[in-house]
Amino acid sequence: MSEKRLTREVTLKLNYYKSKVDKEAGVYLGGVVDPKYIDELEFNIDDDYEFDMESEEFKKNGMYALEISGSNRALKELGKFLINIAMFKTEDDEYHEHIETIKNGNGQPSVNITVRKK
């Protein structure tokens, strides 16, 4: 039995700050508006594991696992933020945005995310 794939179209309003560029001075103002509801997101970074059939135990596989969790509205805002960055037109070859003080698994604000557009 195969799963049936469904398609759902969504409409987004993308929000940006007005750009101002002075290449000679290295000034690039403007960019993507910060996502809302950051306080409802958690990013957990931990060792990754895989199940070993012989020992019937989970063992570290040498990689890291990133778990992102949050409320529906926080995850939607994070997705919209990433699409905003992808769609943002800039002359800045090193354009990036920061999301700061995202909570980790213990609820403390300790994860800062930098998203770079290449």
Please provide the spans of the model-predicted regions.
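Positively charged, low-complexity terminal tracts
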Residues: 1-118
